[in-house]
Amino acid sequence: MRVLVVDDSALVRMAVTDILTKAGIEVVDTAKNGREAVEKALKLKPDVITLDINMPEMDGLTALKLIMEKQPTPVVMLSSLTKEGARETLEALKIGAVDFVTKPDGALVDLSSVAQELVRKVQMAASTSLNVLRLQNLKKIKGEVVRGNWKGKTKDVCVLIGSSTGGPSALEMIIPRLPADIPAPVFVVQHMPPGFTKQLAERLNSISEVEVKEAENNERVKDGVVYVAPGGYHMKVRRAANVVRIKVVDGEPVNAVKPSVDVTADSVVQAYGGNVVGAILTGMGEDGAYGMKLIKDRGGLTIASSEDTCMVFGMPKAAIELGGITSVKPVFEIAEEIVRFLEVKLNER
């Protein structure tokens, strides 16, 4: 595997090169700004690029756009943990970056705390589907809002969506197509660090008909609202006296992640029984497989994103293999399937 390392800091370039080389990954070259990055990407055709966002001459976002147009390559962004960093990182994911690693704060460049994560994400990026990068670039996806035939609402139903690597772009193909009158709350669990999920919710809210917000502890759940699990916490729901409230809880990671789709799924099934529509999108690992099976076994309906429209097919594949999936659909048809499945649930006697 051949990697191009791009950062305006010589210390960061050295640190990243050192981490990757020790893991047996070849660093073919480094670049100190976006302009160099584009030139070297075209010339060297690396398997993966690590890319800083804030650089002189040409920033990372501009470079990323050009690379995606001229030489689509899996890119892992190195970003800061600031609010601005979170916003720029989401923009990078939208443009086509595969994933990101947050650089620890501080003047000293110590990347040892993220070394394992960096290696894992670079290795995963190398195996991602470039067809999916191209699919995102085409942006053919933004269809109309899907209208449902709800008539009178007969029962409490909810929607749960789980995603990881490639998830923000996938969610942009689904959430903006859900109608404002959707007769259910939508719970979204996207694997992300603290701070990033708030930015994700704000971004989705600005392009959607439904309200999208980061979930808050103890808030009462309402239909037509999309609740995004806060990064670094698990999101549960509890029903008491026929009122459903959100519980944002700390605790150990589950499936090595926090928030975990499985944790939310478990509580959703306790609160809603089989009146759940679940969807599992692109992502690495197996989080959500158990949760989708749980929903399906209780009589809920579940959807997995098809392999050819997943950046990483890990989570949907695990859910399918476990027998937890009712229907497999391309990501740009999942909004329709969610609405159709809600109609089925509402019409069940």
UniProtKB/Swiss-Prot annotation:
Localisation per UniProt entry: Cytoplasm
Query: What domain of life?
Result: Archaea
Q: What is its main location?
A: cytoplasm
Q: Which Gene3D superfamilies match?
A: 3.40.50.2300, Methylesterase CheB, C-terminal domain
- Show where the Response regulatory domain sits: 2-118
Q: Which reaction does it catalyse?
A: [protein]-L-glutamate 5-O-methyl ester + H2O = L-glutamyl-[protein] + methanol + H(+); L-glutaminyl-[protein] + H2O = L-glutamyl-[protein] + NH4(+)
User: Which purpose does this protein serve, as stated in its record?
Assistant: Involved in chemotaxis. Part of a chemotaxis signal transduction system that modulates chemotaxis in response to various stimuli. Catalyzes the demethylation of specific methylglutamate residues introduced into the chemoreceptors (methyl-accepting chemotaxis proteins or MCP) by CheR. Also mediates the irreversible deamidation of specific glutamine residues to glutamic acid.
Q: Which family does it belong to?
A: Belongs to the CheB family.
Protein name (record): Protein-glutamate methylesterase/protein-glutamine glutaminase
Native source species: Archaeoglobus fulgidus (strain ATCC 49558 / DSM 4304 / JCM 9628 / NBRC 100126 / VC-16)
Name the gene for this chain: cheB
